[in-house]
Amino acid sequence: MKHRYLPATEKDKQEMLATIGVSSIDDLFADIPENVKYKKEHQIKKAKSETELTRELTKLASKNRDTVQYASFLGAGVYDHYQPVIVDHVISRSEFYTAYTPYQPEISQGELQAIFEFQTMICELTGMDIANSSMYDGGTALAEAAMLASGHTKKKKIVVSKTVHPESREVLKTYAKGQYIDVVEVPAADGVTDLDALRQTVCENTAAVIVQYPNFFGRIEPLKDIEPIAHQGKSMFIVSANPLALGLLTPPGKFQSDIVVGDAQPFGIPSAYGGPHCGFFAVTKKLMRKVPGRLVGQTEDENGKRGFVLTLQAREQHIRRDKATSNICSNQALNALAASVAMTALGKNGVKDIARQNLLKANYAKQEAKKAGLTVMFDGPMFNEFVIKLDEPVRAVNKRLLAKGMIGGYDLGLTYPELDCHMLIAVTELRTKEEIDALIQELGDRHE
């Protein structure tokens, strides 16, 4: 054996060459012209031993900063939430430890039941009739919802509020470009969708209106006022929602939304450099056969026992091909399982309690910011995020906060040029009063 990771012996190589009918490695690559072959020695450094490599990688990893060492006030779509210990134990079981839906699904009854429970809990949170097995993330779920709306209504205009996550809007534009769909953005007014601008933008050619709940600035959009505007001209109403916030807020289904999407990251999925996540997709019953992705249904076998199957597969691209709603042919089964385990471990009361803690702690932070003389923007109903205006660039402030053991908020100037020197602060249930007070004191001292 010449190499611990490439164990083929000379005898093995000769047997393989003989099997394919050549006598040497050079003969194997004879079809490659000599003038394009690289004949010099590769200048590669001497390999490190396993011990040396472990030491080197540990040294590099120690440069990372995480939310265990640092109090994080960074949100903007990825949040530092409580993760029940049981989540990792369950998803690490060999029966579940795959990100993929099995190709012989009915054999994997445990996996299908877990997905079915995920779908059920998403329906309970959103107030919708049907949910799929998951999508890649919240952004792709939103884009898929827009494509469904355009295909269902036969219209080519999507109206989306600028208070929707900017990265989700970019994903939407990418999807829309290939389908020749126009994406029109509606401006914000005091941190929520400008209703007058929305009325002027929606027309008979509008396939859907998309808003976020709570929106990117943390504000609670008035869905009751937006819904009739969205549905004028028979367009569809799409809501991108934070599932944890739905533990307290009225579910979008109560406001006659047609599609509710979002990201299940708040439930049992770590921030992990921004992914992977787990999108969810829920609809009314009339759109059941237009839903992208996989659907798990409950049934009975020939002996009358309860069982689970992948159902309504004729919708999917491996059968309908170009007529399918979507080309998605996978999901985030492992992360959906993590979300399911987290929601189950918390229970209904636990979800409500954590949502309430987010609301109360964020509002405490906002009130303390006002007392410290900081300028709080877009004041109004919120969930766990709010915006403050700073006297200097957010990057500079965050650098100082990091030195004090805190991860600062999101720099809104990165995606909203008009909001340069504005910070989006997220406060979750994991933040303590002492951590919040330390943040406000640091921000307030610099403000003075």
From Swiss-Prot:
Keywords: Oxidoreductase
The protein's role, per its UniProt record: The glycine cleavage system catalyzes the degradation of glycine. The P protein binds the alpha-amino group of glycine through its pyridoxal phosphate cofactor; CO(2) is released and the remaining methylamine moiety is then transferred to the lipoamide cofactor of the H protein.
GO biological process: glycine decarboxylation via glycine cleavage system; nucleoside metabolic process
Record text on subunit structure and interactions: The glycine cleavage system is composed of four proteins: P, T, L and H. In this organism, the P 'protein' is a heterodimer of two subunits.
Matches recorded under SUPFAM superfamilies: PLP-dependent transferases (SSF53383)
Family: Belongs to the GcvP family. N-terminal subunit subfamily.
Keyword Oxidoreductase on entry: yes
Protein's UniProt name: Probable glycine dehydrogenase (decarboxylating) subunit 1
Superkingdom assignment: Bacteria
InterPro entries noted in UniProt: GcvPA (IPR023010), GDC-P_N (IPR049315), GDC_P (IPR020581), PyrdxlP-dep_Trfase (IPR015424), PyrdxlP-dep_Trfase_major (IPR015421), PyrdxlP-dep_Trfase_small (IPR015422)
Catalysed reactions, as listed in the record: N(6)-[(R)-lipoyl]-L-lysyl-[glycine-cleavage complex H protein] + glycine + H(+) = N(6)-[(R)-S(8)-aminomethyldihydrolipoyl]-L-lysyl-[glycine-cleavage complex H protein] + CO2
A Pfam family of this chain: GDC-P
Recorded GO MF terms: glycine dehydrogenase (decarboxylating) activity
Entry's EC annotation: 1.4.4.2
